[in-house]
Structures are given as structure tokens and as C-alpha cells.
Regions:
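Upstream accessory/linker segments immediately N-terminal to the RecA-like ATPase cores of bacterial MutS
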Residues: 37, 90-281, 654, 687
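Inter-lobe coupling/hinge segments of SF2-like helicase ATPases
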Residues: 292-295, 305-628, 687-691, 710
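Long, highly charged, low-complexity intrinsically disordered interaction regions
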Residues: 1-30, 39-42, 249, 259
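C-terminal accessory region of SF2 helicases/translocases
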Residues: 605, 609, 617-710
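Short, surface-exposed secondary-structure boundary micro-motifs
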Residues: 83, 134-135, 586, 600
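Short boundary/loop segments of OB/S1/cold-shock single-stranded nucleic-acid-binding domains
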Residues: 58-78
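Structural detector for short beta-strands of small beta-barrel domains
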Residues: 74-95, 133
Length: 710
């Protein structure tokens, strides 16, 4: 694969106009910005003067009116004028500077824990100040701690005529300094217009201002601006910037896909007919949705450009067998396929499934994981390097040095959000010895709503498996308060007597692995005592991988009836005999996590149940989450509601598209902009390619390389 070109290489920008030259000026061109301050500003993503314009306010404060001290209430933020009546150093636990000011209607204390001698001298008795800060009740009455203030020359001073922006800060750049620098950048904007990369014929959603108008408004909103609208991100000025930001991200993903498609790939013809024989040998038939997804993949695999396809579908929908059929096409073409799973446990489960499916065809499937005995590992690696073994399953160990493939034509990645882009790239690069890039099939059990998928995964083709195999019954879900815990334990005893198995998922009381392990151990001990005839096992994150796998395999074999676990089973083994799951402290978990956990039961023909055990009082958000999980087993509906409740960042996990770090846009809130974003992206790529690099540099960074895999 050729080195991935940057956007500027793919789409060189036109020569700079005077406005663009101003836009490219380094931030050190501003008065008072030396190397040290420039280094601090770089942490905010500011290297050019124009970058300051895109450091947008987090919120606004109304300093356009002065409040009487006597009318102040604790908890409000206010501007006040007053004369210093007393300044003193106090020692109440720590050294502090106290100033008492009065405006005739009341007295207010200003408290400073960090101050200099010159600051103390400047706050002399009789000095008039204008202060702004949060009012709170202190030991001496109402006070402000470290308020912003300035001295007043006369009895009064002009008030602010716009709302005051509050910007995100970085260490060493105080709010006032950043505000002044952005003000200087705005003055430059007045003198030399910022380049608007959107062409005149781009049809923006109605009511959106120009780029210059939008930036001016957001940095200096008039006093009559609607704070609620700005706080909600719904003002037309914000939507204008959100549109451009979404467009920049969408373009970069499309270019990543285009760059990838310019590389040659193996054309998998399957002359041996292995795919057909694989499907005929299966003990079940594919569903319509599985067949459709496989057809998509087969068409891609027959082409001479690399497939990069996302296979998404709910827990238990049968993604693995589709991936295995794609692997059969590679093997039938005399080439190799590798399936990479996020854990050794899941890798072994996939290996067992593929081993059984490929056995009737005489095709050996190798497992490569960290836990293999040295001799077995050496033998497997030699067979992979020679091409004798054509289907390989493993963990991240697959992309490590020392593992060589003869002719790797297909890379399958399970639970893609658990791997970074670079990990997938390293595995794909192992297939480039013959100058061809392997095809990639990326599986995820996180159903992504269509609108979000079209934007967040614009660099991938998408197949959806939207039905479960026949015989699967929906999991009956109930929400139960902690006070009925005894009834839940009795239900576990009943299930175990009937020969069924049970999961008990432990509460997430703390982020610490140690505390989670302790909670799991205490829960297991308590349940063992309450259920004397039941064989109880334990799995938590602090156990050695071998011990964890041993417990999970014992559960799968039926030697353990009740498995107490932390959320390490979220992606785990397939145990059709497990028909009951109890999720303790369910109110602490997110929708997607609850749905993923619930997917561990209901994998056989027997009716299954999930108990969501909660502790009161429930927040409104937690109540809504539990209600959604109780009412729906549809992963796509749950993902849609999850997106509404949490936003796209968490839903996408560590997906490295930058969409989780959007500065202005919000994929759920701004979903109505996306169709127009996609239209505008096509217009720019077709007719204004010289604008693409500038737009991406503004919102994402000129140094980013977008031709990467995945």
C-alpha cells in the first residue's frame, strides 16, 4: 500500500488570496504572543490567528447590567459596583485576602486565596470596583471567591454591550487573556475576510448566516440574545458552524475511502467452490438478512479494489457465520483470511465455531493467542507463514511482529470499537507482500442508527443484519427494586433446579478494578450462602486471563450453575443453556451496555428472562434507560434512544473519526443538517476539490492523514 496522502496532496488548494494569507498568519504575529504563550495556545488547537475564531464559547454570562448588593441571592452570578470598606489578610485555615465592598444597599466580601503584594496594594480602602462572580453564602455573609474585577475611575463606568463569552481554558492562559486574543482575531477578521470554503451554489439550510456573521455573533452576542437558545446549540449562527464542521468530517471520511479504493486488492474468485460447500455443510440455513449481507461481501471480494465493509447487527443475529463464509471464499481462492477478536475468550469461541464449520470441508482453522503453548504456537505460525493454513483466528497477537502470512487476502475484525485504527492497519499491512491490500470486514454488535452511520462511517460500506435466526425468543425483561432481592434469589434457585444456568452481573459501584473485584467476591460469597445447593463461579477483571477463561469454559460446560461476574461478560461465550440474567445496580449502566449484557441470555430455544435490579431513588435519566430496555429487545431502537440520551461519542466508543470530539455540531441535535451535508460534500468533491483541504484544515487539522485503513 502506498503511503497515505494527506488531503493537501489529494486536493491541493488554490493560491491564497489576501484574506487567506491573513488566515494563515501564525498566532505569534499577535502583539504579546511569544513562544511560551504560543505553546500553551497550541494545547487548545490554536497555531494560527484564525484558529482563535474557532475557539468557541462554552457558555455566556450577562454582564450588561449591575445588580444592587442588597438584592443578591446565593447561587447567582452577577455584576456589582462597590467601594472597598476594608482590606485585610486573614488566616482561617489558610492565608487569604478579604475585601469588603459596599454600594449603600448592602455589604459583600471578596475572598482571594491566591494573590500578590501588588494586588493587595491595588485593593486599598476607598477604591471603587466593578466585580463579577458567583455569589455564595460564606462565614461573613454573602461573598464572591476570586471574582473578576476592575477598578472604576469615576462613580460609574460603561456596561458591557454584549454578552460575555466564557471560553474553554488551558493552563497558563486565563480567561481575560484568551478573550483579548480572540478580540484581536475578530478585529483582523473585520480587516481581511475569512475564506468561506462553501461555494455560492451550495444550498445551505434556510436561515443560516454567512461564516463571518456567525463567528461575529457567537463571540459577541447582543444583550438581547436568547441565552436558552445558545445554551441548546440551536441558534442559526451555531448551526452554520455545525454544518461546516459536519461537512469537513464527512469529506475526510469519504476521501479516506477513496484513497483506500485506489489500492489493488485480491480478486477472490473461489475457484474451488468452497463457499458453496461451506453453506451446504452448515446445520442451519442463513436468514434472509444474513444472505443479503453475505451477497454484499461476496460482490466486494470479487472486485480488484479493497472491501472495507461494516457488518452491523444485534447481539445473536449471526454475524460470525457470514464472516466465516467470507473467509471460505478467501480460502477457496487459495488465499488466507484472519479473524481478530478483542479477547482471548472470544477468539477461542470464534475458533471453535469456525473449526466445526470448516471441519467437513477438510480445512484447518488455526488459533493464535497469547495463551498457546510454545510448541503449538510455533507449529501454527509456521503453517500460516507457508500458506498451509488458510483460516486464522486470534487476538491482537495477530498483528504483532513475528507473525507472517503467506497471502493474507481478508481481515475480519470483531467488535471494531475495541480496536484502534492503527491496530487494524498493522494487521492489514501484513497482507501487502504481493503489493495488494487485504479486504476488510468489520463486525459490530452495536447497531448504529442509519443517519449516524452514514456520517460516522462514511468511509465504510455498510451491511445490516436486522433479523434474528428462527427459534430465538425475545428476552423477557423486568425491573425490580432492591427490596425484592430475596424473590430474585428464589427465582435463581428455581432456574437451577430446572437444570438452567444463570448470570449475576455485579454492581459498578466504583471505576476501580480492585473495588469491582471485591464487590463481585462479596456477592458470590453471599449467593453461595443463600443458595447452598448451587455451584457458584466467579469472573472479574482482576483475575488472570487463564483463570477467567477457565471459569467461563466451566460455565459453558455446565459445571458452574450460577456465574457471578463484572461486565467482562459483555462480550463473552455463547451458553444456550443460560436462561436468566440478573443485573445488579442496573441504574448505573448505559443503555447499550444493558442491551449487550442481556444478549448473553436468550441464545437457545428456551424462554429467557433478564432482571434489572435497581436501588432507589432513580434519576429521571436512569428511569428512562430502564424503561427502554424493559420495553424493547430491538437493538436498533435501543441504539436510537441511546443516541438521544447520551449523544454519539459514547455510542461510537473509541471510533477514531473525530466525531466524538465535535466542537460545535451534535449528531443527534443536528441530524436534520446531514442530508444537505452529504449533498454539499458531493458538490465540493466534484466541482470544487481545491476547497476541500482548506475546509478540513480549519476543522480537523492540516497534518491529519486521511488515507488510512479503517
Amino acid at each position: 500500500m502506498r503511503p497515505a496522502p494527506g488531503l493537501s496532496a489529494q486536493y491541493p488548494a488554490a493560491g491564497p488570496s489576501p484574506g487567506e494569507r491573513a488566515e494563515q498568519r501564525p498566532v505569534t504575529a499577535l502583539h504579546g504572543v511569544g513562544a511560551a504563550l504560543a505553546a500553551r495556545l497550541a494545547r487548545l488547537g490554536v497555531t494560527r490567528v484564525s484558529d482563535l475564531l474557532f475557539v468557541l464559547p462554552l457558555r455566556y454570562e450577562d454582564r450588561t447590567r449591575v445588580s444592587a448588593i442588597g438584592s443578591l441571592q446565593s447561587g447567582v452570578r452577577a455584576a456589582v459596583d462597590g467601594e472597598i470598606q476594608l482590606t485585610e489578610i486573614a488566616y482561617r485555615g489558610r492565608r487569604q485576602l478579604l475585601c469588603k465592598i459596599s454600594d449603600g444597599s448592602g455589604m459583600l466580601t471578596l475572598r482571594f486565596f491566591h494573590f500578590s503584594a501588588s494586588q493587595q496594594q491595588g485593593l486599598a480602602r476607598g477604591t471603587r470596583l466593578r466585580c463579577f462572580g458567583e455569589v455564595r453564602r460564606g462565614p461573613l455573609g454573602l461573598e464572591m471567591v476570586h471574582p473578576e474585577y476592575r477598578r472604576l475611575a469615576g462613580d460609574t463606568a460603561a456596561l458591557e454591550d454584549t454578552l460575555t463569552p466564557i471560553y474553554p481554558l488551558t493552563e497558563g492562559v486565563p480567561q481575560g487573556r484568551l478573550r483579548a486574543l480572540i478580540g484581536a482575531s475578530l478585529r483582523e477578521l473585520e480587516r481581511a475576510a475569512l475564506r468561506d470554503w462553501l461555494p455560492a451554489e451550495a444550498v445551505l439550510p434556510p436561515g443560516l448566516p454567512s461564516l463571518k456573521e456567525a463567528l461575529g455573533y457567537l463571540h459577541r452576542p447582543p444583550r438581547e440574545a436568547q441565552l436558552a437558545e445558545l445554551a441548546a446549540g440551536r441558534h442559526p449562527a451555531q448551526r452554520r458552524l455545525a454544518f461546516e464542521e459536519l461537512l469537513a468530517h464527512h469529506l475526510t471520511l469519504k476521501l479516506r475511502k477513496r484513497a483506500l479504493k485506489s489500492d489493488p486488492a485480491w480478486e477472490l474468485a473461489d475457484g474451488a467452490g468452497l463457499t458453496r460447500r461451506f453453506l451446504e455443510a452448515l446445520p442451519f440455513s442463513l436468514t434472509r438478512a444474513q444472505s443479503r449481507a453475505l451477497r454484499d461481501a461476496q460482490e466486494d471480494l470479487a472486485a480488484s479494489v479493497p472491501m472495507v465493509r461494516l457488518l452491523q447487527g444485534d447481539v445473536g443475529c449471526g454475524k460470525t457465520v457470514v464472516a466465516a463464509a467470507a473467509a471460505a471464499r478467501a480460502a477457496g481462492s487459495g488465499l488466507q483470511a484472519a479473524l481478530m477478536a478483542p479477547t482471548e475468550l472470544l477468539a477461542e469461541q470464534h475458533w471453535r465455531s469456525l473449526r466445526d464449520w470448516f471441519a467437513p470441508l477438510g480445512e484447518t482453522v488455526a488459533l493464535v493467542s497469547g495463551g498457546l503453548p510454545a510448541r503449538t504456537r510455533r507449529s501454527a505460525l509456521a503453517a500460516i507463514a507457508s500458506g498451509e493454513i488458510r483460516v486464522v483466528v486470534g487476538t491482537h497477537a495477530l498483528f504483532q511482529a513475528g507473525i507472517d502470512f503467506a497471502r493474507l487476502a481478508l481481515v475480519i475484525v470483531d467488535e471494531q470499537h475495541r480496536f484502534g485504527v492503527q491496530q487494524r492497519l498493522r494487521l492489514a499491512e501484513k497482507g501487502q507482500k504481493q503489493g495488494r491490500l487485504p479486504h476488510q470486514l468489520i463486525m459490530t454488535a452495536t447497531p448504529i442508527p442509519r443517519t449516524l452511520a452514514m456520517t460516522a462511517y462514511a468511509d465504510l460500506d455498510i451491511s445490516v443484519i436486522d433479523e434474528l435466526p428462527p427459534g430465538r425468543t425475545p428476552v423477557h425483561t423486568v425491573v425490580v427494586p432492591e427490596q425484592r432481592r430475596v424473590e430474585v434469589v428464589a427465582r435463581i434457585a428455581q432456574a437451577c433446579r430446572a437444570g438452567r444456568q444463570v448470570y449475576w452481573v455485579c454492581p459498578l459501584i466504583d471505576e476501580s478494578d480492585e473495588l469491582r473485584a471485591q464487590a463481585a467476591e462479596e456477592t458470590a460469597a453471599g449467593l453461595s450462602e443463600a443458595l447452598p445447593g448451587v455451584r457458584v463461579g466467579l469472573v472479574h477483571g482482576r483475575m488472570p486471563a487463564a483463570a477467567k477463561d477457565q471459569a467461563m469454559l466451566a460455565f459453558k460446560a455446565g459445571r458452574i450453575q450460577l456465574l457471578v461476574a463484572t461486565t467482562v461478560i459483555e462480550v463473552g461465550v455463547d451458553v444456550p443453556n443460560a436462561t436468566l440474567m440478573v443485573i445488579d445496580n442496573a441504574e448505573r449502566m448505559g443503555l447499550a451496555q444493558l442491551h449487550q449484557l442481556r444478549g448473553r441470555v436468550g441464545r437457545g430455544a428456551e424462554a429467557s428472562s433478564c432482571v434489572l435490579l435497581y436501588r432507589a431513588p432513580l434519576s429521571a435519566l436512569a428511569r428512562e434507560r430502564l424503561k427502554v430496555v424493559r420495553e424493547s429487545c430491538d437493538g436498533f431502537e435501543i441504539a436510537r434512544r441511546d443516541l438521544e440520551l447520551r449523544g454519539p461519542g459514547e455510542l461510537l466508543g473509541t471510533r477514531q473519526t473525530g466525531l466524538a470530539q465535535l466542537r460545535v455540531a451534535d449528531l443527534m441535535r443536528d441530524a436534520d443538517l446531514l442530508p444537505r451535508v452529504q449533498e454539499t460534500a458531493e458538490l465540493l468533491l466534484a466541482s470544487y476539490p481545491e476547497n476541500v483541504a482548506g475546509l478540513a484544515a480549519r476543522w480537523i487539522g492540516a497534518g491529519e492523514r486521511y488515507g488510512r485503513v479503517g
